[in-house]
Every structure is written in C-alpha cells, then in structure tokens.
Amino acid sequence: MIDPRLQEILPQLASAAAHTHALGFQLEGVEGRRVRMRVPYREDLVGDPETGVLAGGLVTALLDHVGGMAVWVAMNRFATVATLDLRVDYMRAAEPRKDLLAEAECFRLTRSVAFVRAWAFDETTADPVAAAQAAYMLDSDGGRGPGANLKGEES
Amino acid sequence: MTDVLARIPYARFLGLRTQMEADEMTVIMPFQDKLIGNPLLPALHGGSTAAMLELTAVARVALSFPRLRLPKPINVSVAYLRSGRPRDVHAQARIGKAGRRVAHVTVEAWQEDRANPIATLSAHFLIAEDA
C-alpha cells in the first residue's frame, strides 16, 4: 500500500523536473513495487535520422528515471536519490513512431543503496528494447540542502 | 569533416557541440535549464549526462570509422562520480579496441575541473556495416 502522500506526488516526480518535462515523460501506473512510465514518440528525440529510431540516450534517460521512481515506491516516501551506476543492454531498436514504455522494480533496498532492474519496450515486456541494472544512493544530498550545487567550491 | 552530432536530432535537443583540436575531439553540452533533473540542488538529470556521454562515444566512433550507418550501441555502463552542477559539461572519448564488428569506447565527462570527472561511460558499439 503506497503512502497517500507519496501517491499524490508520484505523477510530478515522473514528469515535473525540467528534463523529464522537456522529454515528455509520463507516469502510467504502479503495480505492487513495479512502476511503469511512457515517453510519447517525437521526431526531436530520434537518434538515427535514417531510421527514425529513438536515441539510445533517451532509452537510458527513461530507464534511469523509472528506476528512481521504483526506489521511491520501495521506500514508500520521497527522498533525494542519486544514480550510482547504470548499465543498459540494447536488445533491439525501438520501433519508429511508437511510444517508448519502461518498467522498473527495486528488488533490494539497504540503508544506503537501492538495487533496481528496469526494462524498456514498445509493445510488451516480453519483447524488450533494452534492459537495465542500476544502483542508487539513498538520501544522497548528504544534508547539503537546497542550492548546494550553486556554491563556488568543489564539494 | 562533417559533424555527426549536428545530424542527430537528440544531440540537437541536448544542444551538443563538437570541438576538434588536431585529432582530439571534445563534445560540449552547454548548460540549459531543461537538462536539470533535481531542481533543489540543482543538479543535471542523470539521463542528460548519460545521453551526452553516449553521443560523445557515437561521434568518436563515427569519426574513426566513417561509414554510411551510425554505430549502434550494444550496451553502455555509466558511473556517476559527482552530481552535475548547472554548468557546461565537456566530454572526451577513447576507443580502447576496435575489432571487425565491435568497438569498445570509454568516455569521461567533466565540468570546471578535468581532474574531477562527474561521470564515466564504458560502452560497446556494433561497427560492422552488415551487423
């Protein structure tokens, strides 16, 4: 059961940051610990103009983000999380002019680290475009607080 | 030399620029608000950084192995070393090995200080024309 306070902000967490908004990310839904997101097909997100296939970098961005969403769902609260590392296998090219979908699940949560698996697909999870394995650091702002990255010195 | 990144819509979306100095290619992602993933710190989205690293690798492979098709990524692995500040990002790629079908590439991205990279990428690309 998702905490209603988290449930309420999940759509914003999916799409309200400047980057996710610019890419058109949308929350599709949450089922148990599994989160599903969508990015509608757009010509400016293409990686190969000859084929019209969406960019690998977009697939990576979506997998990174849906993975973070799965971490919040597993924690059942919002916290600052930061991707530690992310590995993506590109199994096939996404179908041109089709929306890209992704699902992620956090399968292990420790005090500091969350371990996530995620898949990108255009029709069904049984025929994935890409698969990812990622680790996220939890409460990663280290108490530095808002505006920490605007300070002059290297942190 | 034709600039590969200028032809790729996603590279234009990210605002990537290529700089050549002798044989050394540097890709620059000038800061834009739309690259931000965490508005509080504020920090670049991991997806902005990862995509920029991957496209730097694509451009580097395309430069060394010019052919009709763009190199296709097989897999990529990104390590995030520091949070990306709201500043320009620079990246350089190195081809560790290029065989008949596959090239292995490593890329490093930094902001003000080259000695303190914000992220690294290691990737394999298919380079064979018929693969």
Where are these predicted regions, by residue range?
Chain A
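HotDog/MaoC-like acyl-thioester-processing domains
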Residues: 1-4, 94-97, 101, 105-155
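Active-site helix/loop of acyl-thioester processing domains in fatty-acid/polyketide metabolism
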Residues: 54-77
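Short, solvent-exposed helix-to-loop capping segments enriched in aromatics
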Residues: 7-17, 69-78
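A generic structural signal for short beta-strands and their flanking turns/coil linkers
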Residues: 21-23, 33-35, 80-86, 98, ...
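Hydrophobic beta-strand-centered segment that forms part of the acyl-chain substrate-binding groove
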Residues: 70-101, 106
